[in-house]
Amino acid sequence: MSSSDFSKVKVLDDVLSTTDSVKYAVVKGAQNITPSVNNAISKSNSSITFNIQTPSEATVLSRRVMIKTKLFFTVSGVIAQGKTRLLDVGTDSALGPFPFQSLCNTIQMTVNNNTVTQNQRDVMFALMRFGDAREMYRYNTSAPVAYDQYWQYSDAELASNNPNGSWSNVAMDPAYQPRGAFRIDRIQGNSQGVAGDAKSVAISVEVIEPLMLSPLIWCDPQSNNQGFYGIQVLNLVFNIGSTNRLFRSSVPGLTVSLGNTASNGEAFGDTQLLIQYYTRQPSDLVPARNVVPYAEYPRYITNISGTIPAGVTVNDGAEYSLTAGQFPTIESNSISLNQIPDKIIIFVRKRLASQTSADADCFFPIKRLRVNFNNKAGLLTSATRWDLWRMSVESGSNQTWAEFSGCATRRVANQPLNEIPTCGSLLALSMGKHIELDDVFAPGSIGQFQLQFSVEIENFSPTAYADNTELVLITMNTGVFVLERGTSQTYTAILSRSDVLSASSMPGYKSSDVKRLVGGNMEDSFKSLVGLPDKGSGQSGGGTSGGGTSGGGYSGGGTSGGGTSGGGLSGGGRMKKHLQ
């Protein structure tokens, strides 16, 4: 071995790392911090509208916007066999996760003259399974949050991880609370009876939810927390759709309708947007232009024809095992994309429109995948199910192997060991990391690209699904949201071929360095990174990055989101005027 094969580095014990001076942080905050409560200007059982005039264009708004509302609804059905009440909230029944937004077909937000729209119900249950689950669960004091881990709620009723469970199901870590532990203001009509009795139960509850709509933030990103300014008018419209995901229960045949006797038929009460306003200190000088990271999540749906057979339980006398029902390969439609997304999310589920309160947020397990992208065919054909799970975790999924694979082992006292179906696969792939790209392309590249894929799935559940399933693709397209003097614009697909090639000669960051510096949440994974230091500076968040121009014209700093990353080199010609 030659000494040129390695270099020597001195590593000093922390105890011995003494110094004759320390750095002392001088914390600079806002001159005024004003929590603002904004009432809806119009409200019905089909839509809610807000129109908010900001104090001034110089006022900084927190991008963590909360909606607070009372929900009034009625659950009707007949008491099930072996039950004495229609609903046993905290055991077999509970609210769904983020119940208000689960009602929204679309959320439309207009900032100044620019409008962004998201198909909320179509994408939110998938997006919840990405990023840090612990940070998502921090909202469980203001809204039920827990996501489903079981395919069917009946399997979860006696389990400690029952998503519909009560406070008694909370273990030593109180951060993880089941949805049945959330306080319901009023339950009326859930009187005792016998099996077959018809009941209508009126429920009233107040929730406070973070809006899951970019450029707003809803997790706790470490690199993407800056506010935005340059706003004159903020308008939001919530279009209300079906109630089939509002309430969840293992009791079959329930119907859920908006409004109840306590609200005179109205579904919403005291509906407000909670926004935090910040007034800068007189010494804070910032550009008129403000740039923040942005992402959009368009979805592409392919309806599936045919019957997906049920799984079969095999009893060998000592244990029960599941044999999955098999289904022929499912082919997606050929999808035209005008940019290369950061990530793609693929799943197969019962059609959202066909789901009922008895259906968990579950997806058929994916065992094989084949991708055709940009004239390259047969990508990932040899990947095993375990490979696909590891790729999903690397792309930000918080699913466990037991959840992704669709089956887990359970032991109940005095019963044989048995296998039960779990919530199934949300497959996530990062472009350029898991799906190969040519040297002139990267996530965010503009162009015309064709994507087509096929999946093989299994069904471990005891239910066959006939002509009521769908294959869903969600693409994560990132870019920037630019505000200046009362106007705003969104930009995605901001990289040209020359931008990608010129970046090849720049000093590089390792992926692990980026994750360490900017965090690991879904909103930290946007390509418009904020908070990265100049390569080789040895500082994180220092200098200009996150400093005097934090959240300003350079989106967090000279390198991060500014002149280099997202600007003149990596932002392309049409972005240069906005980021320099």
Show which residues each predicted segment covers.
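Short, low-complexity Pro/Thr/Gly
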Residues: 1-542, 574-579
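Long, intrinsically disordered low-complexity tandem-repeat segments
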Residues: 540-570
